[in-house]
Structures are given as structure tokens and as C-alpha cells.
């Protein structure tokens, strides 16, 4: 979606809402009492959720567009709702003033940027963080005030630390690997 589409919707939202069915409105899942929102509940988003949930509990909300994934997450007792992160109407239902952090874990960099711009245009003033796959995206995100984490750069360091630990265990006579 383009920025013009979002502008059009924002200007005409009240008129358009009168055409929503009652069934649609009732289908909206609760998004209240949220401090952290994770957009995209694939591997990265799920990993972030699992890291944050022990501390933040139900104040963490995952957003996923794929129905099957939403159901899988709910079966695992995760608080995940089905929504399109680029849909302004969804964000109007979220109290952005109580949200402290939104984590962009969508697979498409341009969609992450679009959603970040949308959120800022809607008045979101909390923290934005994103996992990125390319170094040039880190700079682009930071230029827009988004904290960027290079997934592959950090993954390599973690992989090396893990391998080094294995090597140390193998060389340690008291290790169970021998």
C-alpha cells in the first residue's frame, strides 16, 4: 500500500466505518493492556516473543497475518492476533499510547519501513526496533529513528561463541563430551 492510500483512509475513516458489518467488529480480538507488540510471528518474531514473555507476560502481543500460524501460536498459549500490520484500521484499535515498544519482524524490509512510517504518522512515539538482514538496511532504519539489529551479523557471533564453547568442552577432561 502506498502512503496516499493511508492518507485517504485516515481522512475518510469515519465515513468508511459505517459500512463495517457488526460481525466484523465482533471478530476483532482484544489488543488492550499491551506494552510490547511484535509484528511477524515467524522464527524471529517467535524467538523474540519467547524471550520477552517470561518477564512481560500477557503485555506482549504478537501480530501475524497467516491464519494457520495464529492458530499454532494460540495452541502454544501465546497471545497472538491475526492482523495486517500495514492496516491503519488495526492500529486505530490498539492504544498506541500504552505501547512502549514495537518490534518489526516482518520478512520484507520495505514493509517494515512502510509500517514504521504508518505508525509514526499515527502518532506513535514509543520505541521501534527491527531485525534486518542487510547492513545497508541498518543505516536506513537508524536514519528513521528505528533501532536496527543485523540478524545475520549477530547470528555469526552467536554461532562462533557456541562452537568455541563446544571446543572448550571437548578439551576439558571433566566434560561429559569425552
Regions picked out by a protein language model, each given a short descriptive name:
Residues 1-178:
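Cytosolic regulatory regions of ion transport systems
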Amino acid at each position: 500500500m502506498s502512503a496516499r492510500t493511508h492518507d485517504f483512509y485516515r481522512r475518510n475513516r469515519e465515513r468508511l466505518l459505517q459500512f463495517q458489518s457488526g460481525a466484523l467488529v465482533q471478530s476483532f480480538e482484544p489488543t488492550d493492556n499491551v506494552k510490547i507488540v511484535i509484528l511477524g510471528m515467524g522464527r524471529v518474531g517467535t524467538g523474540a516473543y519467547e524471550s520477552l514473555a517470561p518477564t512481560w507476560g500477557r503485555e506482549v502481543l504478537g501480530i501475524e497475518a497467516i491464519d494457520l500460524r495464529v492458530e499454532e501460536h494460540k495452541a502454544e498459549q501465546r497471545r497472538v492476533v491475526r492482523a495486517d500490520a500495514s492496516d491503519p484500521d488495526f492500529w486505530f484499535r490498539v492504544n498506541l499510547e500504552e505501547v512502549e515498544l514495537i518490534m518489526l519482524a516482518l520478512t520484507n524490509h520495505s514493509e517494515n519501513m512502510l509500517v514504521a512510517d504508518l505508525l509514526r504518522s499515527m502518532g506513535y512515539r514509543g520505541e521501534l526496533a527491527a531485525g534486518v538482514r542487510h547492513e545497508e538496511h541498518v543505516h536506513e532504519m537508524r536514519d528513521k529513528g528505528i533501532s536496527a539489529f543485523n540478524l545475520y551479523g549477530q547470528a555469526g557471533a552467536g554461532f562462533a561463541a557456541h562452537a568455541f564453547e563446544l571446543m572448550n568442552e571437548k578439551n576439558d577432561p571433566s566434560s561429559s563430551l569425552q
